[in-house]
Amino acid sequence: MALRFPRFSQGLAQDPTTRRIWFGIATAHDFESHDDITEERLYQNIFASHFGQLAIIFLWTSGNLFHVAWQGNFEAWVQDPLHVRPIAHAIWDPHFGQPAVEAFTRGGAPGPVNIAYSGVYQWWYTIGLRTNEDLYTGALFLLFLSALSLIAGWLHLQPKWKPSVSWFKNAESRLNHHLSGLFGVSSLAWTGHLVHVAIPGSRGEYVRWNNFLDVLPHPQGLGPFFSGQWNLYAQNPDSSSHLFGTSQGSGTAILTLLGGFHPQTQSLWLTDIAHHHLAIAILFLIAGHMYRTNFGIGHSIKDLLEAHIPPGGRLGRGHKGLYDTINNSIHFQLGLALASLGVITSLVAQHMYSLPAYAFIAQDFTTQAALYTHHQYIAGFIMTGAFAHGAIFFIRDYNPEQNEDNVLARMLDHKEAIISHLSWASLFLGFHTLGLYVHNDVMLAFGTPEKQILIEPIFAQWIQSAHGKTSYGFDVLLSSTNGPAFNAGRSIWLPGWLNAVNENSNSLFLTIGPGDFLVHHAIALGLHTTTLILVKGALDARGSKLMPDKKDFGYSFPCDGPGRGGTCDISAWDAFYLAVFWMLNTIGWVTFYWHWKHITLWQGNVSQFNESSTYLMGWLRDYLWLNSSQLINGYNPFGMNSLSVWAWMFLFGHLVWATGFMFLISWRGYWQELIETLAWAHERTPLANLIRWRDKPVALSIVQARLVGLAHFSVGYIFTYAAFLIASTSGKFG
């Protein structure tokens, strides 16, 4: 018999129903469950697939550069970044009538185009790219790296080049390599690029391969470096009247600590950014020499962990046994990596708008909104993934004997206390926040807005004041004008910081009031509830009072029959599934808050947010309804306009989202019956009955239908909000 899909599971390949296809797709990447898998092959497969992943990333970024060079208006944008709209790529659509062609022909293009809201123009401009030729060169280089990655992936699947398991488990060497080699050397290389290409570019000096050996990045060259007079590199920075990309008002400094923003570009000083990357490079280069490898010097991570027993015995045997537990569990390592990456992605969202690093990006409001929302959603998915793999670790990899009384075992021992505390925090936040919002709603409905309960966020205001914000009048730390820190800050370190904090046109330490206080606690409710579901799912993954032998059922079982008092919806997968809804809900609140506050800031009517955000009707009416008018007007009696694509996407997003419920709120028997009826009709219909299928059609399993429903819900939810966000922002600010 010919090999049927899936080849990795002979059991599934012989399944006579359509379950074969769906289960095959679902388990294609679960290498551990494949036939004749060994630990060695498992590691080698994952390693090789990393190169494929890199190849895709390089190909994708190469495509961005290529399409902008070919169909964009980068060179025109460089001449006037604030008024030319950056083009992502052309649109060729045979359905376009004349009104559509006219609506989408913008940015000086000859035909219909898409506008770029990704910030790539600002990024490329900041790092020194100026011409289409530069973009093509970058695209070709990335294409080359993509091909190289594919070759490397193929190479490491050949018998001679397959690394051994011991190589994969050599944690110290890997850590040294990643810290020094990846983070250290790449940060140093980036500093080099900024100093040699980007900073001269910002001063009107065009540095390329033909002249980069002749153009000194600093008038004194490496003299100050070797003589130890490093402060010379910080002298004579760009002046506040510097015009970015020209020599007008420029200085000669390359590594500075100015703080604050370049007055014209509203972005961080490039010389500060170079200084930052140099510091990071030194830190990581040192960190990458700390662990013991072939040379017998440095720390052994196992020794560090074994020795780390907290005093007083309150954490039992501390970190004993953790080294082998982590080093032998891919799921534990993936969980740690995802948790770290998730936090970093969310931090990127927060910092890209509050401390913009790219020239003129702060004045491109739609891009700011798109980037913030994009990074927050990505962070949410990555963080939920961390807990999912944490749960799989407990089911597949956790060994109680190896971890007796260490911090991991004690987490499991104390899980009731952890879960109940999280539950209490979620209930407290939910009832109090909703109570305040609803009270305020009722007061407005009855025409007595003065009876609202409005709480000033005094602790948060105090923290902002401590960092230098003077408008609250707290007179503490950096906002205390006669304190030593304030006076040192004016001259020695970051003189621009205090100006930036108190400048109301940027997004650094936005002024906050009662509306912020309420939405902060609404978001805290969402975060705590999401965490509760995820933590409970992971800590109960091996077993609970109701189902002590849960680990024997694997990660994603739907139910264990009618006994035991009801064992449906309690698998670790079910917890992940529920948590994703809460994650989306929470990030919805986060992005609503960010977007509304910024729209009012950019429009200069901050009082609208302050007055309307203290009650739910304000959010529904003055944020969602008021800002959806652009979408509703995408198509109107006068024809269409450039927002119509977002109007269409808004409707399509709702359709996808609503389709999710068809899978989420429906029992399996209904679908099975429907499918059998359809199959029966098909087999008895002339012509149609000439086409037969090999697999008997069966309904999706409960878990699969939930996954399909969750995927539609998530994708539709994000599509809908993306269209709303981009249309409402670009409709106002262009």
Swiss-Prot record:
Q: Which SUPFAM superfamilies match?
A: Photosystem I subunits PsaA/PsaB
Kindly list the GO molecular function terms attached to this UniProt entry.
4 iron, 4 sulfur cluster binding; chlorophyll binding; electron transfer activity; magnesium ion binding; oxidoreductase activity
The residues that hold chlorophyll a B3 are: 662, 670
Q: What is its EC number?
A: 1.97.1.12
Q: Where are the transmembrane segments?
A: 46-69, 135-158, 175-199, 273-291, 330-353, 369-395, 417-439, 517-535, 575-596, 643-665, 707-727
Look up keyword Plastid and say if it applies: yes
Which positions bind chlorophyll a B1? 654
Query: What membrane topology is annotated for this entry?
Result: Multi-pass membrane protein
Which Pfam families does the entry mention? Answer: PsaA_PsaB
Q: Where in the cell is it found?
A: Plastid, Chloroplast thylakoid membrane
The residues listed in the UniProt record as binding phylloquinone, with positions renumbered to this chain, are 671
UniProt cross-references to InterPro entries, sorted A to Z: PSI_PsaA/B, PSI_PsaA/B_CS, PSI_PsaA/B_sf, PSI_PsaB
Record bears the keyword Nucleotide-binding? no
Reactions performed catalytically: reduced [plastocyanin] + hnu + oxidized [2Fe-2S]-[ferredoxin] = oxidized [plastocyanin] + reduced [2Fe-2S]-[ferredoxin]
- Supply the alphabetized keyword list: 4Fe-4S, Chlorophyll, Chloroplast, Chromophore, Electron transport, Iron, Iron-sulfur, Magnesium, Membrane, Metal-binding, Oxidoreductase, Photosynthesis, Photosystem I, Plastid, Thylakoid, Transmembrane, Transmembrane helix, Transport
Quote the record's cofactor note. Answer: P700 is a chlorophyll a/chlorophyll a' dimer, A0 is one or more chlorophyll a, A1 is one or both phylloquinones and FX is a shared 4Fe-4S iron-sulfur center.
Q: List the record's Gene Ontology CC terms alphabetically.
A: chloroplast thylakoid membrane; photosystem I
Kindly report, in one word, the top-level EC class recorded for this enzyme: oxidoreductase
What's this protein's function?
PsaA and PsaB bind P700, the primary electron donor of photosystem I (PSI), as well as the electron acceptors A0, A1 and FX. PSI is a plastocyanin-ferredoxin oxidoreductase, converting photonic excitation into a charge separation, which transfers an electron from the donor P700 chlorophyll pair to the spectroscopically characterized acceptors A0, A1, FX, FA and FB in turn. Oxidized P700 is reduced on the lumenal side of the thylakoid membrane by plastocyanin.
Of which family is this protein a member?
Answer: Belongs to the PsaA/PsaB family.
What interactions and quaternary structure are annotated?
The PsaA/B heterodimer binds the P700 chlorophyll special pair and subsequent electron acceptors. PSI consists of a core antenna complex that captures photons, and an electron transfer chain that converts photonic excitation into a charge separation. The eukaryotic PSI reaction center is composed of at least 11 subunits.
What protein name does the entry list?
A: Photosystem I P700 chlorophyll a apoprotein A2
Phylogenetic placement of the source organism:
Eukaryota, Viridiplantae, Streptophyta, Embryophyta, Tracheophyta
Which gene holds the coding sequence for this protein?
psaB
